[in-house]
Amino acid sequence: MSAEPVVAVQGMTRRYGDVVAAEDVTFEVRRGEMFGLIGPDGAGKTTTLRVILGLLAPHAGTVRTCGLEPVRQGTELSRRIGYLSQRFSLYGDLTVDENISFFASIHGVKGWKPRRDELLDLLRMTPFRGRLADRLSGGMKQKLALACTLIHTPELLVLDEPTTGVDPVSRRDFWKILSHLQRDGLTLLVTTPYLDEAERCQRIALMDRGRLLTVDAPSHLKAEAGEAILEILARPKRQATERLRELPEVADVQSFGERLHATLKGIDRANPEATKAAASRLAADLAAHGIEVESVRPVLPTLEDIFIARIEAAGLDTAAAVR
């Protein structure tokens, strides 16, 4: 594995007029890893990608992609990367095969048919090679777009929110394909607002409102989260949430389906006795206020818990921070 990163971003800032879309962003993407830029809409993910791809010039800082300066060496860079944008353009009146053929010609790929067959087999699209793109489902269109993006065998695959608007089954299938590509040695840089997808990345950068909050492996971020978290199943849920937020020993309350996650103020996860005592106190308090408590138990933090904590530590508003 080469020691030189495939992507190196150092102190990058990009503005749109008076609006700072990305501020002093620094991170590296290592060869052979799947790296995720994670954050809500407006976090600066797409702007950062466009600077990395050479579609925008930074106003400050430096960026190197595949060892090249993206803006100055854009033509050479385009031969070495694949970019699946949020609005990748397929030709609806062309078949699957014809779309792939078209993109192979754009990239000047010679003898591309064996590569096409390999990709169609990987994507389980061989039976549909004669179908018009307009007649494919949303998930199948996304697979075809991926095949077109990979036809020239890039060393870096960049994907901007590739599963937005895709049904859950197709979304899961698409990420399995990306994981397969990564295991085969391809370097991937992907943006997503979905924290469950971030779990599939080797490392992630959490972004919010143009600022980089942290860069690390998801497992490391979870291990470093210090304050204990209680998972609470109580009804009515709304009243339970309101009461928990009134308690001085509760630092934060987040909703996860039917359950609540209450972060305890000043109680470390490494102190199970204190966590157990706090759980008993919270359960008793909720019951005293007429709230039915089914269960209270300590749990490991989710990436959403960590993201919220990082946003709060940075002094930012947590509203609409995650999906």
Annotate each language-model stretch with its function.
Residues 85-88, 225, 229:
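Short amphipathic alpha-helical interaction patches enriched in hydrophobic/aromatic residues
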Residues 219-224:
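Short acidic-hydrophobic catalytic motif
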Residues 1-13, 313-323:
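ABC-family P-loop ATPase nucleotide-binding domain
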Residues 215-216:
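ABC ATPase "signature
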Residues 205-206, 309-312:
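Short low-complexity, flexible loop/linker segments enriched in glycine and/or proline
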Residues 226-310, 323:
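Short, charged/small-residue-rich alpha-helical element at the C-terminal edge
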Residues 4-7, 14-207:
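ABC transporter nucleotide-binding domains
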